[in-house]
Design a protein with these regions (language model features):
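Structured soluble/peripheral alpha/beta segments that form catalytic or ligand/cofactor-binding pockets
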Residues: 1-312
């Protein structure tokens, strides 16, 4: 559901739909959202992962509507739910229209003691940024008309997540892929500078969805970072808990620029690619490999004061 009912600025909320067709030669991210404040407005961002270009479409805040009891958002003539999107954009930047439907959604499991990917941190009030995963992997049906090109996404695969709060973090690394050799396998991982009281800590959340089981590693689960190296061309990251060890190597690639929220406006310029790859190895600490593979067409963001992120 939308979290901004009756809230005052600073506040933003955005949803991220990753869309890849069956032929894997069309890759898009569509990001609807809203930011409240003096320069408040609704928006829809569109990232073309093949071309490495993006467009940012602005709507008056009063053209944003959200249901109070479920996730359904409308921005102008555009509709967004977990099961489908309907887009109708025609301005000086781009023309985009069509309907996509999503089947076989795989939401991050929600339990009374762990309400989603953030665990008990989801109950902490006034955190800078909250995160949620609506579907780790699903199939797509339908098509989009993008300018003069008709793109059939039927039998493609998608992913949906969301962010909300006051601002994006000072620094973070995020990557995601659900295009492994074994269909349905997905990884989503992020590490960021998290303000806490008068200080900050390095918080992380990782989920590996494989063969119908979710392996989670997070600050709140007691997992720890063994290695985190950010290079010009890659991110090397190793985490472990009492049972498992997870090795990840994300290869960076060219992408496009998205706008991200500050406490005042959509002022962060965030480089994101849909052309990265991520090598994953999950094993039991006692011995025995559970999964090894390379995720294609990974979304990847590496942003902000990385020296501070690494130093925490």
């Amino acid at each position: 559901m939308y979290h901004g009912h009756d809230l005052k600025p600073p506040f933003f909320e955005g949803w991220y739909y990753k869309l890849i067709n069956q032929a894997e030669d069309q890759r898009y991210a569509i990001i609807p959202g809203i930011i409240l404040g003096e320069r408040g407005h609704a928006f829809i961002q569109v990232l073309d992962g093949i071309q490495g270009t993006s467009t940012y479409h602005v709507f008056p805040a009063d053209q944003f509507w959200a249901a109070g009891d479920r996730f359904e958002v409308r921005i102008g003539a555009n509709t967004f739910t977990p099961e489908r999107i309907v887009v109708q954009i025609d301005d000086e930047q781009a023309r985009l229209s069509g309907e996509l439907r999503f089947d076989g959604l795989s939401p991050w499991p929600v339990r009374w003691h762990s309400p989603g990917i953030m665990g008990w941190y989801a109950w902490v009030p006034r955190m800078e940024c909250y995160h949620g995963v609506l579907s780790l992997d699903h199939t797509i049906a339908g098509s989009l008309q993008v300018n003069d090109q008709s793109i059939d996404f039927s039998a493609g695969r998608g992913y949906i997540e969301k962010d909300w709060g006051q601002s994006f973090p000072e620094a973070w690394v995020w990557f995601q892929s659900n295009h492994f050799q074994s269909p349905g396998t997905c990884i989503t991982a992020s590490v960021a500078v998290i303000p806490w009281l008068n200080s900050a800590f390095r918080g992380f959340i990782i989920g590996v969805w494989h063969q119908g089981r979710l392996y989670r590693f997070a600050t709140y689960t007691g997992a720890r970072i063994e290695e985190l190296l950010i290079r010009d061309d890659s991110v090397h990251w190793v985490v472990s808990d009492r049972q498992y060890r997870l090795e990840m190597e994300a290869t960076r690639a060219q992408g496009g620029l998205l706008l991200g929220p500050t406490r005042v406006e959509m002022g962060k310029r965030v480089a994101e690619t849909l052309n990265a790859s991520v090598q994953v190895r999950l094993a039991r600490r006692a011995g025995g490999e559970l999964f090894q593979g390379t995720g294609r067409f990974s979304g990847l963001e590496v942003h902000g004061a990385l020296e501070r992120l690494l130093a925490l």
